[in-house]
A protein has these predicted regions:
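Short C-terminal tail/terminal secondary-structure segment
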Residues: 2-5, 235, 246-264
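C-terminal helical subdomain
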Residues: 193, 214-245, 252-254
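Conserved glycine-rich cofactor-binding loop
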Residues: 13, 18-22, 44
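Substrate-binding pocket helix/loop in short-chain dehydrogenase/reductase
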Residues: 104-105, 109-117, 215
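Active-site helix of classical SDR
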Residues: 128, 170, 178
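Alpha-helical segment proximal to the catalytic Tyr-Lys
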Residues: 133, 182-187, 243
Length: 264
């Protein structure tokens, strides 16, 4: 029962969507550093390829870019087929692709709802559904469940102060979808979500540029999330030590859900 075996993901095949930068890159980097073969996909092909090359150079695992627009149904299906064609199975799926949209209540556009609910919820379902055969083959080959990790948000748990109406609603929906999926995939696949607090990413840039010091001081941990914080949580859920955890929403937030003033 040593830690190195409980949290080993060496040799695992993983797919991290939105893996070209931000939180997705943080998770992919953690996987590669611990010996996994990681596929990353995002709409920004240049960022995707650059990240894959950099992570492979760091090793000891490897990283492969498969660019695609994961807001589109056809691109999700094509990505799933490409993974099956290359590997025949999948051990870990991290659904991280997402977007946000902020505007006042009076000016909040209808387009925000279409964009965010499609990318943040519907396409998570689309891709997970399309990859079920590969995930089931991964479980059969390893003798342990394959893992699905959905990247949610503390905004899906507590009501945020900022006017990100469609975003917070989409993350609450994603958390509920996580639990619903976990109840349907049985013992061959676990499904969990990470409800993230503030991390340095493109999505959080404007907020952190304006409020980083105040936000950090409002958290019990008095700092913004670091790459190793989210990578460690994903590795835990992906390794043998996380095998009996499913249908759970795990806050990785420095205590953001504890204090009301820490809400974004």
């Amino acid at each position: 029962m040593d830690a190195s075996s409980l949290f080993s993901i060496k040799g695992k095949i993983a797919l991290v969507t939105g893996g070209g930068r931000g939180v997705g890159e943080m998770i992919a980097a953690g996987f590669v550093a611990n010996g996994a073969k990681v596929y990353i996909s995002s709409r920004d092909a240049a960022a995707c390829e650059a990240t894959a090359a950099a992570l492979t150079a760091q090793g000891p695992g490897s990283c492969v870019a498969i660019p695609g627009d994961l807001s589109k149904y056809d691109d999700c299906i094509a990505l799933a087929k490409e993974i099956e064609s290359r590997e025949g199975k999948l051990d870990i799926l991290v659904n991280n692709s997402g977007a946000t949209w902020g505007a006042s209540l009076e000016e909040y556009p209808d387009a925000a709802w279409n964009k965010l609910l499609t990318l943040n919820v519907q396409r998570v379902f689309t891709l997970t559904q399309a990859l079920l055969p590969a995930l089931e083959k991964g479980a059969a080959a390893s003798g342990s469940p394959s893992r699905v990790i959905n990247v949610g948000s503390v905004n899906g748990i507590d009501v945020p102060v900022l006017p990100t109406f469609a975003y917070s609603a989409s993350k609450a929906a994603l958390h509920h979808l996580t639990r619903h999926l976990a109840g349907h995939v049985g013992k061959s696949i676990t499904v969990n979500a990470l409800a993230l607090g503030p991390f340095r990413s493109k999505m959080m840039k404007a907020t952190l540029d304006a409020f980083e010091d105040a936000l950090a001081q409002s958290l019990p941990m008095k700092r913004i999330g670091r790459p190793e914080d989210v990578a460690a949580a994903a590795i835990w859920l992906s390794g043998p030590g996380g095998e009996w955890v499913t249908g759970t929403i795990v806050p990785v937030d420095g205590g953001a859900t504890v204090y009301g003033e820490a809400k974004l």
